[in-house]
Amino acid sequence: MENITPLRKQYLDIKKNYPEAIVFFRLGDFYETFEEDARIAARELEIVLTSREMGKGLKVPLAGIPYHALDNYLSRLINRGYKVAICEQVTKPGETKGLVKRQVTRLVTPGTVVEPNLLDSKQNNFLLSLYLTEDSCGLAFADISTSEFGCTQLDINGLEAEINRLNPAEIILPKSQSLNLPLHLKATISKLDGYYFEADVARERLLKHFECQNLSAYGCENLPLAVSAAGALLNYLEETQKSSLKQLERLAAYTISDYMQIDSHTLSNLEIFRSSGGNSLKGSLLGVLDQTKTAMGGRLLRKFLGQPLLRQEDIEKRLSAVDYFFEESLARASLAKALGQIADMERIANRIRQKTILPKELISLKNSLETVSAIHRQFGLMPPPRLAYFLNGLKPLPEMLDIVNEAINDDPPSTLGEGKVIRSGFNPEMDKLCSLAGDARTFLSQMEAREREQTGIKSLKLGYNRVFGYYIEVSNANLADIPQNYIRKQTLVNAERFITPELKEYENLILNAKERLLEMETGLYEQVLNQLGGFYSALLSNAAALASLDVLSAFAEVAVRNGYVRPLFHSENSLVIHRGRHPMVEQGLGYGSFAANDISLSAEDCQIIILTGPNMAGKSTYLKQTALIVLMAQIGSYVPAETAELCLTDRIFSRIGAREDLSAGQSTFMVEMVETASILNTATSRSLLILDEIGRGTSTYDGLAIAQAVVEYIHSQPSLHAKTLFATHYHELVELANYLPRVKNYNIAVSEDRGEVVFLHRIVPGGVDKSYGIHVAKLAGLPGWVIKRAYEVLTELENPAKKEPKIRNCQPQLLLPLTEQTSALAEEIKGLEIESLTPLAALNKLYELKKKAEEQGL
């Protein structure tokens, strides 16, 4: 350590505290990275990797970025899961003896980003904290850019669905715990010492933060696991932010059962937040419904979709507001135009609280406040009864508007220090400093003209740089003409630079004025932010009201465009949808092109629909559209149908499509059975089940047996009796309607004409005994020979007189004749009593048969 430079020692002292982060070390106008951090930065940011001598014979890898480009480079690292420690110079050069003092002012992690240009405006940036036990979990989340802070305690089986709903950027866990994330989630996992999750430690941290004696007011006094997660989250934020967390002034405890429960598989199958094909917004329900104009509205819509309501009163409030905007097209259009001028007031409020807001953002706030006043004049003075509930928080803030108008210039720069942020007339002393700094250009221009005239040197010029300050530059050819009061300051190749006593005196005056100007402008700006901070809660209330109006008017806009209707709710356990449609498929086809269908499900007489018919005919679409209509209704949206009479549904479950979980070592069939078991164990009589091809991942008879048993269980189990749509290729299941009174058969209508098959996409009563699989294979482009041969084999299989189809050679030379050896081997296999073999014995027998086959050259 004796041979390293003081700067190197300072860096190492800082770096040892942040071993898992890339340290951005401020050196003048650059942030530098060293050693392995530099190699990572050079690779990920595509910047030059160089080196710097930082001790006797010690060259250290180095890569740097300009300080003003921090956000751009920071976003690239954060998006790739890195953590970045921002190490700033906290004293000025010359203020202290020796090195400039440096310290980490903030640790930026994926879940603690607050910079607007690094965030998705319509999506929360959640930091999630989890504390797991064998069968339960404490969960807390926070978005420090919006001040949201919540917690819950839930069954471990519901954890994946809640993680999917929140879609966090980062997850905190105790060091002793681990978590398998769904493949589509890109969250960074951060480990925290288990000490911070201990009940007493976490509780004390929350009590200290909220300055209270107990947590009853926050609803989590009796949720110990939730308290552990929330307290640990606060500790993590305190460590990373290095600043006050006052914006987290409320902890909202909630219960999963307060909302419709949708498991992670159903969220994915129904494509609520992202399409299954491209994993994008397009093709998802969110993509159809998102006609919001504000960032706050976009985030609220996501929350609505993840937490459909269970109280009819709350749903009706939303639907009544949608009614108003649906009927009042001029009001809807006017509001949409106004909302388009609203900035992200929620995040602006928090940046004011954190004192990180830029001057230009205050102008965006000013414009938004003016628009709030206009919206209030339109709706708030005499609130339409159907909107009154959602207008409660909408209050003009003229005092806040006055503060910005009086203090901030209309077109301020992005940074402080030039005297152009604070409005002229706001502070007389600052006006004088601005005048002095502004007069500098005039003075220098006049002095340059005077010196040229007095010396006769026409090429003489005055200039300035940060190293040498102000100077007079004279070319070498004119050096003989310089006056005696010129003092040499710098020698160039073709010129000399000089200073005069007059210029030096003015330089000191100007530089002192600029330094004083920066200090004064910074101080005045902070005073303005302190004043604006007093309106924090009122600003958030306005943001919440605008977000609600935005979402509900967007629902109306979508309904008008797509011909949706208001759903009606009743107390009976039934749903009746007339000419329902799939919202995403319809949008892809174009309005009016989708084949609409009816559905009627009732716990009393038609509890289960067995749906048969060919692939590609629309079975899955029919199942999904029913679930989507139910979900849309319970978030307060109109629905794609001619009429919809619904009951409240507590859970939606889906088992659709084949999926492997290779990371857990589970086959497609095992995944299917696990999901089915979960559904049967947790569904209630108020649930909606959509099940597609249960049992298809195993042998025909095993699959048929499982499918039939599942239907019988749903029908007959007293605690279940869930309304169910059951699509299947097992045509034998249509017989269940003969002895299970609440099972009904429906099928996808097909038209056959001279061997040609046309799928009509209509759902009609009755079962079918054909799958039309070969027709689908033909549409897929299988060779003609294969299609022709498949029809022949199908005919033979359907003829009871012929038990096995004859094998016809397509390429005889590729088919090997049976030999005595193969016959003997076949007989040995046939003679095995598989049921009596243990797994180990079966494996040994398999190896034995394989060895015999290899020895016989088979």
UniProtKB/Swiss-Prot annotation:
Stored CDD domains: ABC_MutS1 (cd03284)
Keywords (A to Z) from UniProt: ATP-binding, DNA damage, DNA repair, DNA-binding, Nucleotide-binding
Molecular function (Gene Ontology), one example: mismatched DNA binding
One GO BP annotation of this record: mismatch repair
GO terms for cellular component: cytosol
Residues binding ATP, per UniProt: G613, P614, N615, M616, A617, G618, K619, S620
Highest taxon of source: Bacteria
PROSITE patterns (UniProt xref): DNA_MISMATCH_REPAIR_2
InterPro entries: DNA_mismatch_repair_MutS, DNA_mismatch_repair_MutS-lik_N, DNA_mismatch_repair_MutS/MSH, DNA_mismatch_repair_MutS_C, DNA_mismatch_repair_MutS_clamp, DNA_mismatch_repair_MutS_core, DNA_mismatch_repair_MutS_N, DNA_mismatch_repair_MutS_sf
A Pfam family per the record: MutS_IV
Family classification: Belongs to the DNA mismatch repair MutS family.
PANTHER family reported in the protein's UniProt record: DNA MISMATCH REPAIR PROTEIN MSH1, MITOCHONDRIAL, DNA MISMATCH REPAIR PROTEIN MUTS FAMILY MEMBER
Function: This protein is involved in the repair of mismatches in DNA. It is possible that it carries out the mismatch recognition step. This protein has a weak ATPase activity.
Name the record gives this protein: DNA mismatch repair protein MutS
Source organism: Dehalococcoides mccartyi (strain ATCC BAA-2266 / KCTC 15142 / 195) (Dehalococcoides ethenogenes (strain 195))
